[in-house]
């Protein structure tokens, strides 16, 4: 099986009903960085504290423009002899063009890596399923593990799951080992889990539209307010210390005539009328026919609000509780 070919699609399930599942991550992409100045360079570009990142931990982060608007939301970690991060494939080319602008002055090589396989493992007894192939499996205390050519990431939300950066051979071996035990699915299942977890999904339609706090990046420890300068720092700090941010990321669920696209508008029920509000970041339709939407909305939105996709009069979406506190 080619590393570029996704697993056969099936409609996603919520984490509470998900059997053991191997998930192809064709909608995500890997970037690797190597060289003596790699950590220093990333430290000046990303919102998180890359310099303090241990080899057994990852960090969420945003890469912003000078106005503090996100090119992308990413997950950064140690990988082989350097660093790496994973982001949505739709933003990688444009984000890399920005990231590389000043790299010519640093000893770091930045590569879009499509040779590695990105594989999700989620659902019932996912951790036990990996134990037979890997001597070291990550957990909540040590969310990153390294085993030969594979880096394994552990995500606690919405339920324990794993992301493997590996080789086609390891992917095939894992698929063979779990044949008859695990179902297969494409990246829509991983997207559904990210929506349920409240992990921001920034696709190309929403590039440079939002500051990190509008997508709850601070709630996921993806912003350091103590490190030195980085791109967009002034605006990100202003949002925290001057209360400049009025938006937050939400998980909505309900019915819609079709899953909205990234960048689509929503409407909020106000008495007998509907008022345009917010922006869709991501959406998916589940096996039971319901639709999940991740959206940026005003951060004073009432928990009992009723919304729908713009002009979808038959739709009805309600706010779902996120598994973390948003904070500032």
From Swiss-Prot:
Protein name (Swiss-Prot/TrEMBL): tRNA-modifying protein YgfZ
Primary site of residence: cytoplasm
One Pfam family it belongs to: YgfZ_barrel
GO cellular component: cytoplasm
Residues that span the membrane, as ranges: none
Keywords: Cytoplasm, Folate-binding, tRNA processing
Subcellular location: Cytoplasm
Originating organism: Sodalis glossinidius (strain morsitans)
Gene3D superfamilies associated with the record: 2.40.30.160, 3.30.70.1630, Aminomethyltransferase beta-barrel domains
Residues annotated as binding folate: 28, 190
Similarity section: Belongs to the tRNA-modifying YgfZ family.
Task performed by this protein: Folate-binding protein involved in regulating the level of ATP-DnaA and in the modification of some tRNAs. It is probably a key factor in regulatory networks that act via tRNA modification, such as initiation of chromosomal replication.
GO function terms (MF aspect): folic acid binding
GO BP annotations listed: iron-sulfur cluster assembly; RNA modification; tRNA processing
